[in-house]
């Protein structure tokens, strides 16, 4: 199996490859997920001539770590750095993408001046505090109905031993809080063309915050879809993937 080396251990990654890619997406998943829940998305990108690279972050999937503990934003960013280096070997534009916590890491990378990303995509981005995580001393249990209404996806989550909806969230809340402290001052300085795709009925990450930022920040576009938090795995997943492909096309 392919792994990325890191001080915390070896992190598993997947590569959905096309024969002649015209772009590559480097993807960071969210809490409780792993790369294996994104096959549909990978195949949709492949059909459009785009490679997808994704890593099981620490505490998730086949990578080491306590359940649900991503470590620091810098830990996840280092994994994205390694994956970006692999994706760039094809000599095609690289698109940075993240979902939920992965979106927070992706935005940190852009604001810190990562020049390798031609553009970025974020989904389910929690840009303001999440009520369930304000008490960092407790664990969280997500209601699967908060995530998606797609019965296929919900069945996958229920029967996937690598996916989960509950874990200690001390580390997660700590790192998200860093984002919430930073974004008010720094996010208006975003310079990289970025598409936010978001479910109108997302009960975890408020779409209102994304709307407000998109109105202020010229490079940040928002496309809204009927659905909940895991919009890439919602009933409208085809439409969401198509919107992302259209956005990438416009950047090439």
Residue spans of the language-model regions?
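Short beta-strand/loop motif that positions the catalytic acidic residue
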Residues: 190, 196-198, 202
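Catalytic active-site module of serine/aspartate enzymes centered on a nucleophile-bearing elbow/loop
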Residues: 220-252
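Conserved alpha/beta-hydrolase "acid-adjacent" motif
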Residues: 203-209
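N-terminal cap/lid segment of alpha/beta-hydrolase-fold proteins
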Residues: 1-17
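Active-site glycine-rich loops that stabilize anionic/oxyanionic intermediates
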Residues: 22, 30-33, 200
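Conserved alpha/beta-hydrolase
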Residues: 35-37, 42-66
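Catalytic nucleophile-loop/oxyanion-hole region of alpha/beta-hydrolase
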Residues: 31-34, 61-90
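The alpha/beta-hydrolase serine catalytic core
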Residues: 116-189, 232
């Amino acid at each position: 199996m392919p792994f990325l080396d890191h001080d915390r251990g070896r992190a598993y990654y997947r590569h959905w490859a096309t024969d002649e890619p015209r772009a590559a997406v480097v993807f960071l998943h969210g809490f409780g997920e792993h790369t294996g829940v994104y096959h549909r998305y990978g195949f949709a990108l492949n059909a459009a001539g785009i490679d997808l690279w994704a890593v099981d972050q620490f505490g998730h999937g086949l990578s080491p770590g306590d359940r649900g503990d991503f470590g620091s934003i810098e830990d996840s960013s280092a994994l994205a750095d390694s994956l970006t280096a692999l994706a760039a070997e094809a000599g095609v534009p690289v698109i940075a993408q993240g979902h939920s916590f992965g979106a927070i890491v992706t935005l940190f990378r852009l604001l810190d001046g990562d020049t390798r990303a031609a553009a970025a995509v974020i989904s389910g981005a929690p840009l303001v505090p999440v009520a369930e995580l304000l008490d960092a001393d407790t664990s969280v249990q997500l209601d699967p109905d908060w995530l998606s209404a797609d019965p296929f996806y919900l069945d996958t989550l229920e029967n996937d031993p690598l996916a989960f909806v509950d874990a200690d969230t001390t580390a997660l809340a700590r790192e998200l809080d860093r984002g919430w402290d930073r974004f008010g001052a720094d996010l208006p300085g975003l310079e990289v063309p970025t598409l936010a795709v978001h479910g109108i009925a997302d009960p975890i990450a408020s779409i209102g915050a994304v709307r407000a930022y998109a109105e202020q920040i010229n490079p940040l576009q928002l496309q809204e879809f009927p659905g909940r938090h895991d919009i890439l795995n919602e009933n409208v997943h085809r439409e969401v993937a198509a919107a992302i492909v259209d956005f990438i096309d416009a950047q090439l």
